[in-house]
Structure formats: C-alpha cells, structure tokens
Amino acid sequence: MQNWETTATTNYEQHNAWYNSMFAANIKQEPGHHLDGNSVASSPRQSPIPSTNHLEQFLKQQQQQHQHQQQPMDTLCAMTPSPSQNDQNSLQHYDANLQQQLLQQQQYQQHFQAAQQQHHHHHHLMGGFNPLTPPGLPNPMQHFYGGNLRPSPQPTPISASTVASVAVATGSSEKLQALTPPMDVTPPKSPAKSSQSNIEPEKEHDQMSNSSEDMKYMVESEDDDTNIRMPIYNSHGKMKNYKCKTCGVVAITKVDFWAHTRTHMKPDKILQCPKCPFVTEFKHHLEYHIRKHKNQKPFQCDKCSYTCVNKSMLNSHRKSHSSVYQYRCADCDYATKYCHSFKLHLRKYGHKPGMVLDEDGTPNPSLVIDVYGTRRGPKSKNGGPIASGGSGSGSGSGSRKSNVAAVAPQQQQTQPTQPPTSQLSAALQGFPLVQSNSAPPAASPLLPLPVSPAKSVASVEQTPSLPSPANLLPPLASLLQQNHNMAFFPYWNLNLQMLAAQQQAAVLAQLSPRMREQLQQQNQQQSDNEEEEQDDEYERKSVDSAMDLSQGTPVKEEEQQQLHQQQPQQPLVMNLKVEEEATPLVSSSNASRRKGRVLKLDTLLQLRSGVMTSPEQLKVPSTPMPTASSPIAGRKPMPEDHCSGTSSADESMETAHVRQANTSASSTASSSGNSSNASSNSNGNSSSNSSSSGTNSAAAAPPSGTPAAAGAIYECKYCDIFFKDAVLYTIHMGYHSCDDVFKCNMCGEKCDGPVGLFVHMARNAHS
C-alpha cells in the first residue's frame, strides 16, 4: 500500500520552494499582511519531517547577492517590526518587497526635486515686504517662494519614516501651506535714534505751550546748529512754527525768527548770546538761554528728579504732581491745569471760562480769564495783581496776595453797606499770609486772625476802613490761605467762599442800624494827627505795663458769684466789658507769646474809656485808661484760662454785635464794638477811681436790645469760631492744650495752626 502522507509532503515542499524562488520578488504585499498571512498559512502546513535544508541554502545565496546593501537594510529593520524568528521564509519575502518600495520612492523623490526646481525657475518672485498685505496676515505670493524656506531633501538613503513623510508632503503640499503659520512680513521698525529725535521736539513743544514766555526757545547744543538752522517736526509730522508777537510774521527756523525779532528791538537794548544768534531785550531771558548752553538746571522738583533752568518751568512742572484742574470750561467738560491751553480751547471753540480754582482746589471768583489778551495767566476782577498761584508766571503766590491786601481797603471804603456775596468772596483773596507766631508790621492795612500774639493798638487805628462789613474775614477761608500748601483732601469739593459769605451774611443780619451808624461815624471821625498821638501813647503803655501772668485765677470768686446772681439766665456768657488796668497791653516787643486775647480785652477798656468821655465819639482817646466799670472789673485773665475749672465761662464768649465790631480779622477790633455798644447803655457807674473794686452792680445785665439777652454765643479766640451751644464749645476747647493752644490736648500732637488742629481732630480718633 502506498504511503500518501509521505508522498504529499514531498510534493508540497518541492512546489513551495519553486513558488518562492519564482514569484516572491514580483508580488507586492504590505509588510504586516505578508508577514502575518504567510506565518499563519505556513504554520499549519509545517511538516514534522525536517525540511529546512532548502531554506537555509536559499537564504545563504540571498545574503551573498545583497551583501553590499546590508547596511541600509539593517537600518530599515531597526525601524520596522521584525518578523518572527520561526518563519525565515516570510523574512525573505519581506526584504524583497521593502527593497522594491525603497527604489520606487527614490525615483519619486528625484522627480519631485526636478519638478520643484523647474517650478522655481519659471515662477520665481522677489521676496520681501508687500505693502498691500496687512501685518500678521499671510502674504498672497508666499506660496511661490514658500518652498524655498524648507530644506530640500537629500539624495542619500533615508529611513522609511522620512520617505513616507516626503511622499505625504508631495501629495498635500497645498494643505500644508494653508495650515502652517504665516511668516512675519511686518515692516522693520525705525531705528531708535530716529524715533527719539522725533519725540524730543514734541516734548519740547509741549513745554513751550504750557510754560511762560521764558521757555519759547528750546534747548540746543553748543556745537550743533541743526536745531536752530533746520525746521523741526514733531512725531505727528507737523512742523514747528515761530510766530512774531509784534507783527505776526511766521518763521520756520530759529535763526530766521531771531533775525526778524532783531528788527523790532532797539539797538541799545539788544542782548545777544555769545555762542549763537539768539537775541533778546531781557536779561533774565539771556540768563536762561546761557544756562541751556551750559546745561545748568538749578531748579529741581521736590517730588521727583526733574530739573529746569527757571522757576516758571518748575511751577509748570509741579502741576503734573497735582490732581487739581484749575481751569474748567463753562460750556463743555474740558478741564486743564495750564492757562495757556485753556485759552487756546476758548479761542478755538468760542466757549466761556468757568470758575477758576486755586492750587488747593478752592473756587476763586475774583480771578477772570483774559481770553484774547496777552496776559499770561488769569487776572483779578479789580485790575490788581493776581491772587492765585496757578497762573504759571514766575512770581510767587504770597507776594501777589500781599499786594492785593494793599488794594482791598481802598475799594472797601466806598462800600459802607453790606456787599453782595461775590464781593465778600472776592475780599477773601486780599488778606496777607501771617504766621501764627509772628507779629505783623504796624503799617499793615489788614490784620490777620487773632492768632497773632503781640499786636499794638496802633496797627488797628491806622486802618480807617477796618469797620467796613466787607472786611469781616471768614475764619475758614483765611486759615486755608495761611496754610495753602497743606493737602486738605476732604475739603477740595467745598465752596469755601460761599460758606464764608453765608457766615458773614448771618452775622450782619443780626446787627441793628444804630451799630452800623456808629461804625460809620467811627471811620469818619478818625484823623491822622489823632492816630499818631494815640500810637505814641499806646506804645508807651505797652512797654511800661507788661502782661502779668502771675495771677492764680482768671476771675475773682466774688465777681463770679455776682455775675451768676445778676445774670441767672446766662450763666456761661462772658461779657467782654470786663477788663482792668492791671493787665494792660501786651508788650510790643513780642516778649510774650500771647494769642491775642489780652490785647483784645485791653483795647476794649481803652475804647470804652473814650466812649465814656464822649458817648457820641466812637474812637480811642489819648487820655490815660480809667478804671473798669463792669460788674467784674477786677478780673485778671490768664493765658491758659481754658485749662481751669471755669473754662467754658472764662473763655472769650461774644454776642453777635461783638462780631460786627470785628472789623478786621484780629480780636482787638472785635471787642471794640462790644465795648462801644455796652458803654453807651451803661448807667453811669464807670469812674476812674474804681479800678480795684469788684462789687459794682449797677450794670447788672446787658440791655434788652442786645443779642446777648436773646442767646449766648461762645467764641474760641484761637480758632475764631462761634458756638451757640456751651457743650460743643467745651468739647472744642478741650482739644486746646494748656502749654500750646495748637497742640492736641488729647494725644499731644503739635498741629500747624487752627486748620491743622481741625484736620487732626477730624482724621484721628480720640478716646
């Protein structure tokens, strides 16, 4: 019987060897598919009979034939999945297919390179920036030279992954170009030097437009004439022009402008720079110009490192540190810090100026804007100097305010009646700035607040216009002027002038017509000769009789009890008719730092003694001061009387008619009206021999027509504030320290004047 298994196996092996040798190299199959399929197909057909001799011989022959391609084949085998070790026949077929694919891909690559070179040769466009393409968008001609940006493939043998990527890129080159980010085709930036040269003229132009006439010439170097001989352009491309203020001729260079300016100058007044053609008629202009040549900037800002050549530029620069816009348009929302820019706005649009603010943000109705005039900065309504420090000129604000003080009394002499609110507000700008620890000069036309310690009566009597109601200085506005450099952030939005006018209107409304007549008569009856005699007499008394501070109590107990018995309805009202000769004027040598209260009471007695001699004549006589005729004539006030147990009763408390008599900001004139009104209603108990008697009871109560009978008014002489409530007055006086009235009695902090104390009380919590 024939063995079919042996025969079939032998025939199959021979057929398989013949099939592999003839057709394996010509059949194209995927490596994985060929590997798996051949492995699966051949594994079940494996015969248990060993038949590996034919395969080993065939593999040895193939290795000898392709020995020169062994190195690239090793690389491909390392990057591709290796076939199974059990199937050597599948490995042989895989190697043959991979070699054929590699050859085809190399041919495709060569054709691609040739086509790309030919395309680049026929369709080459110049690269660079296209002005029609917006920055950041793809260039429309980018696809023509985009291929040049990629490295060309090398003809050397490459891996399978690289070849596959090149083939994919060839088939979808347009898609890749659409997906790749666009190249940066924005134009190159200008050099830093040119940009700085464009910005510098604009900056200098801004300084010229905002500063004074002293800055109309920009900085030029000593050895470079391009800035003065060539036109200057700003960053917007606008050329700088130089316009003659005399004839209106416009020049485009500084040299031409200076040459034209010389024609308007007198030959004997021409001042020329030794280093350039600059000419001027003013010495300070030439001085500033020479400082620019030498690069000297002596003026420096105290808040930053800015330096400049003159004070005007520094004042203009300091406005950049302020948040107050002093100039506002009445017809629109335009606001600026510089008057020059404000005038340009008003001229351009035909608008009207609004309320001008001071440097601290306080409205100043006394200033007006001369829109079409040549004045730099605002001007005052009365034609006098400017009372605001924000005009941009070189002079300081303090000198302007002191000059206005000399003009104000002349205008107020012609206004005996109550002025309107605008005039009252405008009068606030005319008071000098006097420190709280210094005595004003005797010839000062207007006196400050009663915080000045040593004032002579001569300074009061030398001002015939003092009793005018327009001179009643509101305390808050005056104190702000004394401390105009302080930052009062909570009070920036307050119209302080309106508040002051309301206070004055309320005080003037309480005055009787007879008081106004008396004040007018007092102005008319004073003469220069009498003032000189009175000045000499009072100066002699002030030197001979210094203030006695050795008294233990400010008020005698008997007199205080008598005052309570005679005035039970007003136990806390202090009648200012109560001074004696024992505490006369404060010495004019300013030896004692009294805050003005003794001066006020002493002047009261002198004025009252003159009224007792002639009741119709309300002026200070030159006779010796008689004894007091008040119920508490023996009272000796102390500087620190508010620290005693009777602080609320012993402090300076006045009625409304006393406030009317306060014709100046000092307390001396304030008490003069009180004494004149009270002495005219006295019962004749005032005699020159009763100075030591403290039991006079003739003038028991004030007249029924006086405001003291209607209601009590308490006044703090240090802050010049009135209180209608004794509790509020006592609380306020509790903040004044005994040794220093402007030192907080609660925490001990030293404050800068009454406004500083008020700000301290408002900002800090005290237990």
Curated annotation (Swiss-Prot):
Gly residues biased stretches: 386-397
Compositionally skewed regions (Low complexity) per UniProt: 105-117, 518-527, 661-704
UniProt keyword list: Developmental protein, DNA-binding, Gap protein, Metal-binding, Nucleus, Repeat, Zinc, Zinc-finger
Gene3D superfamilies listed in its UniProt record: Classic Zinc Finger (3.30.160.60)
Gene Ontology CC annotation, any one: nucleus
Compositional bias (Acidic residues): 528-537
Gene Ontology biological process: segmentation
PROSITE patterns in UniProt: ZINC_FINGER_C2H2_1, ZINC_FINGER_C2H2_2
Pfam families documented for this protein: zf-C2H2
Biased composition (Polar residues): 39-51
Annotated localization: Nucleus
Major subcellular location class: nucleus
Zinc finger boundaries on the chain: C2H2-type: 242-264, 271-293, 299-321, 327-351, 714-736, 742-766
Span list, region Disordered: 30-51, 105-127, 174-212, 357-424, 518-570, 610-704
Composition skew (Basic and acidic residues), residue ranges: 200-212
One function term, GO molecular function aspect: DNA binding
SMART domains tied to this protein: ZnF_C2H2
Keyword rRNA processing appears in the UniProt entry: no
InterPro entries on file: Znf_C2H2_sf, Znf_C2H2_type
Purpose of the protein: Gap class segmentation protein that controls development of head structures.
Family: Belongs to the hunchback C2H2-type zinc-finger protein family.
Protein name: Protein hunchback
Species, as recorded: Drosophila orena (Fruit fly)
UniProt lineage: Eukaryota, Metazoa, Ecdysozoa, Arthropoda, Hexapoda
